[in-house]
Every structure is written in C-alpha cells, then in structure tokens.
Amino acid sequence: MNAFNKLYQLVGLTLILGLLHACGSKPNPEKEKAYQKAASILTADESFYPIIDEELYYFTNQTLDSITPVYINEQDAVKKLMKKETWLAFTTRDFTEYERQTLISQKYLPRAIPVAYDGLAIIVNNSNPDSCITIKDFARILKGEITQWNEIYPQNKLGVIDVVFDNPLSSTVRWCVDSILGGKQFKAPNIGAVKTSAAVIDYVEKHPNSLGIIGSNWLNDKRDTTNVTFKKNISVMGVSKLDSATRYNSWKPYQYYLYNGNYPLRRTIYALLNDTRNGVPSSFAHFVQLPKGQKIILRAGLLPRTANMNVRDVIVNKE
C-alpha cells in the first residue's frame, strides 16, 4: 500500500469518527432554554413604544411569530442584551467599542442596524407666547446658564423654565448629554424627569412654564395621514441653527426637515442585534428594514432609513 492510499484511509477514518462523535453528542437543554427565553423578548427605549408596537402588530400578523416588547430606559435595554437576556434592543446609539469587543470575545457577532431617524422635539405649553429657540439657547438651558424664560425672550412672563425629560436613563437624556453637552451631566435644579414620554406631554400640558423634550414619534396626530399635524394639546417649538431664532429660520421635526438636514436635533434609531441563530429576533429586525417595515416608519411620522422619499412642492392658492 503506497503512502497516498494510507493518507486517504487516515482522512476517511478521521471523518467517520468525527461524524460518529457528532451523532452521539447530546443537545444541551439548559442552553436551548436560555436561548429561547431570550428570543421571546426584545427591549426598546420607552420613547419608541408607538413605532415598535405598530411594527410588531404587522410582523406578528404576517409571520405568526411571537416576540414580546419590554419598554424600559435605553441603558437597561442594552444591559439586558449584554447579559444575553434578549438578542435584540432598539436604541439611539451603536454598540460601544467595549460592548462590541466583549461580545466578539464570547464568539458572538453583534450588529448595529440603522432602521430610522427621528427628531428630538422641544415642546411647550400652549399658553407660551414663544414658538422658536436656537440650539445655542437650548444648550444654555441644559447647562443651567439660562433658567428664566425672560432671559431668552424679554417679554415672556412665565418665570422659571421648568425642564422635563422622560427618564434619567433614557435615550433622550443620553443623546442630549452626548450631543448637546459634550458628555457633561445636567446640574441645574430646574431640570427633572417624569418617567415616560406620555407623562412629559401631560406635564407640559398642565404647566405653563414647562419645556419638555421627547422623541418626535410621540407627537403626530394619528388622524392626519400626511404627518403634518402635531398634537393640539401642546406646542412644538421650531429650532434654529443660527444665533437668533425666527419663524423663518427655525424648523420643526417634520419628516422633510429631518430628511434635508434643516432640523438640527436628528438622531438615528438602531436595532442592536446579537442573535446567533437567525431566529425571531433576527426576523423582526430584518422586517423593520424591508419596504413594508420602512413604510410603517414613514406612516408613523419618522424618517425611514432605506425607503425612497418623494418630495413634492405645494403651491397654496390665496384667492
């Protein structure tokens, strides 16, 4: 028997032994149970409740798959993903390099999938006479350099600016800290939180001197399919990039102004995915990226990540 035949026999024997070992290996029921439990839920920042619920409604009706949303603050949503308590989290940030490398070192393949853009909306009580603000003044409010309405608008008599967020650990707070304050935390005593986005709207509606910050997907009037009408019980401020805000240089978080970059408080919504089996979490993240999922985002008043935008000029006849 020549050397080549011996080599072929050795390779064949190795393959057979490998197959026998694979066939004889037993599945790990605890590992399977842990995967299925984590695959049964997704986590999302509470501010995404309206859009995620709508996406899930169409996804479950189309696929008959089931996945339960857990709406919490962004920080805890990511923590659950890192602890393998879920394989999917919706946030307004990518994985940090530490998070990514930690998962890779554990033989995972984490992916951050941009799915949409939304605007961070600044809302005030309907009795507030002022309707626009500069980015510079907004930052000064968050830094505590401005605490009274008349420091921005001399004729405004509403007194202290009562700033209200949804949750101290929410995506809204984190985005403002990172993008507006350069990583510095809020210190002003007139800045607080009321747990949820719905509670922010309710608070602003009842307090004339308040200023609320929420995701724009909470604002759209569901009766208006054109997404150009905001809720009537509060006012949405226009935001200007210039040093002086006027109605002509300030923009509200409408889809077109998110699209063309006029609205400055735009943020990306990510699906953070760590599903190793392409199970239901992967299917749902993929669904949100598909034309149908993107159309749902468009209809909800947000800016889709991948869908084509048709922009039409409207001529108003004043006769």
Kindly give the residue locations of the regions a language model identified:
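Pocket-flanking alpha-helical
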Residues: 75-106, 222-224
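Exported/periplasmic ABC-transporter solute-binding proteins
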Residues: 23-82, 113-116, 124-319
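Short, glycine-/small- and polar/acidic-enriched structural segments
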Residues: 95, 110-115, 120
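Short, hinge-like loop/turn segments at secondary-structure boundaries
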Residues: 86, 108, 230-232
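Peptidyl-prolyl cis-trans isomerase
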Residues: 98, 107-110, 129-132
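Sec-dependent bacterial lipoprotein signal peptides
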Residues: 1-21
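Short acidic (Asp/Glu) patches
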Residues: 104-108, 253-254
